């Protein structure tokens, strides 16, 4: 009998992507995050779909519809907690996935990397518009402050802000359109993720050594399917622990109060996964400068392949670059902490130093370290 998975037009694609795919034999647990992100996306789309069945995107009823979901809908509290904390798990996996790419030089697959950066931006946009939907205090003021940054654009700024708002303030029109964006974007992300995979399978996976693994490859199934299954179990365990035992751990208490345009919260801050970028934004006293720094903090990822100076692809055998990479990691954690603090000393100066170090590390120190390591490895006789 002819093997259907190798001949059927649809099954053939699945077979070449997830079953008979030749995979390097030495990829570590850091290569699990792609499948974990796929799982996160599926969880978010499913929980989001069921939440959307009960949610109303109207300023008068949005807040109470979320309360209704939690109180009156069967397992509505679980859906909401999984969706809110699923976003946190999503970003956790995203940051680790990007970090893995930087550490092991995966960014040298330029098409895959660039689509990945676009995916990161799309997920950030989805999370941002989704945060307005519960119509709590922090939802309202967070959306007001961040959308208002568009007004820093010379000449067209103010017009642009009012165009995004659909009026002169964040109101019903804004909520309705943000709900529409929040619904459509995950499907765009799914399409982009497919393209991301398509480009990856053109070249094959990178591996911890950063060398050509063609001489030693194994089929994806059963080796990596079982490995991915273990990762998924651990992800689900962590998500359930978070959603069932401390669902409000990562949220803001201000969001338990309905949105009130007449009362500003003492500290306006976004969700934890945006705090590093928010800290960079706040560290520059000029509005336009801050907005440009905010954009640069993410878009800098696009030029990382151009800044690769080392002869070795991976950082596995490059101690100087490794040290700088872990300093960058610590720096991002510091920025995340600063983003959640009030604008006063010593937080201002710490934020400014950390922001400066962030760009200095990526643009200057890491490329220099790569060049120095090349020099050190050159035969001296």
UniProtKB/Swiss-Prot annotation:
Q: Alphabetically, which GO biological process terms does the record hold?
A: mitochondrial electron transport, ubiquinol to cytochrome c
GO (cellular component) term, any one: respiratory chain complex III
| Annotated heme b b562 binding sites | 83, 182
Q: What is this protein called?
A: Cytochrome b
Q: Which family does it belong to?
A: Belongs to the cytochrome b family.
Q: How is the cofactor bound?
A: Binds 2 heme b groups non-covalently.
Provide the GO MF annotations for this entry. Answer: metal ion binding; ubiquinol-cytochrome-c reductase activity
Q: How does it assemble?
A: The cytochrome bc1 complex contains 11 subunits: 3 respiratory subunits (MT-CYB, CYC1 and UQCRFS1), 2 core proteins (UQCRC1 and UQCRC2) and 6 low-molecular weight proteins (UQCRH/QCR6, UQCRB/QCR7, UQCRQ/QCR8, UQCR10/QCR9, UQCR11/QCR10 and a cleavage product of UQCRFS1). This cytochrome bc1 complex then forms a dimer.
Localisation: Mitochondrion inner membrane
Spell out the CDD domains in the cross-references: cytochrome_b_C (cd00290), Cytochrome_b_N (cd00284)
Q: Name one Pfam family in it.
A: Cytochrom_B_C
Query: Which spans are transmembrane here?
Result: 33-53, 77-98, 113-133, 178-198, 226-246, 288-308, 320-340, 347-367
Cite the source lineage: Eukaryota, Metazoa, Chordata, Craniata, Vertebrata
Q: Where's it mainly located?
A: mitochondrion
- Which organism does this record belong to? Pseudantechinus ningbing (Ningbing false antechinus)
Membrane association type: Multi-pass membrane protein
Please list the residues that bind a ubiquinone.
Answer: 201
Q: What does this protein do?
A: Component of the ubiquinol-cytochrome c reductase complex (complex III or cytochrome b-c1 complex) that is part of the mitochondrial respiratory chain. The b-c1 complex mediates electron transfer from ubiquinol to cytochrome c. Contributes to the generation of a proton gradient across the mitochondrial membrane that is then used for ATP synthesis.
